[in-house]
């Protein structure tokens, strides 16, 4: 008995329920002029995604391939903004991690004694 891969089913389900609001792209995965302005209702059991682009999951692996789904503390901390009816993720975590690593490297560099200068007394 043949089975349907779950990934294909999720992609097909997502494509069916995706909102298509005035896309001007010629790429068939981004909507078409035939469906311009059509709003397909979102089923309550599925999480919303931000853009519906197949490649977005490569940039948001920590969100379980659901970059538009607001999860836990991210929902409270305001890391998402709404523009043109689509949810876009702000990479706040990446910025905070970069700032933290920069602070740690600066503090470790300031603790080193340079050659030629006397140690502090």
Curated annotation (Swiss-Prot):
Residues 22-47, 101-121 are annotated as: Disordered. It comes from the Eukaryota. One of its GO terms (biological process) is cell differentiation. InterPro entries: PPDPF. Keywords: Developmental protein, Differentiation. Residues 23-33 have a biased composition (Low complexity). Residues 101-110 have a biased composition (Polar residues). Probable regulator of exocrine pancreas development. Belongs to the PPDPF family. This is Pancreatic progenitor cell differentiation and proliferation factor. It comes from Salmo salar.
């Amino acid at each position: 008995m043949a089975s349907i891969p779950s990934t294909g089913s999720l992609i097909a389900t997502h494509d069916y329920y995706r909102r298509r609001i005035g896309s001007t792209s010629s790429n068939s995965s981004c909507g078409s002029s035939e469906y311009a302005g059509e709003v397909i209702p979102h089923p309550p059991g599925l999480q919303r995604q931000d853009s519906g682009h197949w490649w977005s999951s490569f940039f948001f692996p920590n969100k379980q391939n659901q970059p538009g789904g607001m999860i836990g503390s991210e929902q409270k901390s305001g890391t998402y903004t709404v523009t043109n009816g689509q949810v876009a993720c702000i990479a706040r975590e990446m910025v905070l991690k970069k700032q933290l690593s920069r602070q740690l490297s600066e503090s470790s560099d300031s603790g080193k004694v340079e050659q030629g200068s006397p140690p502090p007394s």
